[in-house]
């Protein structure tokens, strides 16, 4: 990704984003700054920018981290703990903005376009982004949007990791009915997406990563997929993320794909105390010596 003249001017002129926010816990190596950006529909939305303490303006890797459904950007930022400071990278956690809803964007086209602008937004707030080392990491809806960002903007990313992602929005809509707040989620989905899967199947299809198997496979970008056989939110992960991994490998047998499974609760592994450090190490963002040991299985990508 190349930055234009206006962005370069902003990078030079803008100070590194201000002091550590009082709304965020004090960490030894990482500071958090609340910034704002203008979304695709013109609305101002917040984002949390995580930076190493004492960041001096040198080029730095950037992780784009979209949040899960109904979760705010600050809660998503807290999942990272002190890892950005320990690894020497930045993380931007945008609040997001869908077609109609903010915290339930579910892969809206405008939201994915906004995610692709996050390196420029971070740069405008004083971060000297190493454009060769931009990554996307998210869980649940954030994992869905990570995969869509990879499919639609493959040249932007040096790596992507999705934890327990939604991969089939048609299936998700009908499966919402089995959840405690399922009727509310279905109502929100109809508002955000524009109908039901029966009334507007294409609207659900274009928000589903499994619609973009060829693009994901041909992106030639390292991809990590994490999914649980005991997920009580996306209860059919073997038929969603598991199948997506198989299809990607089938489309490109040489795809740089890691496919892991276990028995954790929904997105429980996307946090600093669980699998997130291992995902970062695989992208060279965290030294292996700083990765806690933890036993989990790698699943061969063969069949469902």
Predicted features along the sequence, with ranges:
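Acidic catalytic loop of the alpha/beta-hydrolase fold
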Residues: 229-235
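Short, proline-enriched alpha-helix->beta-strand connector loops that line the catalytic pocket
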Residues: 216-223
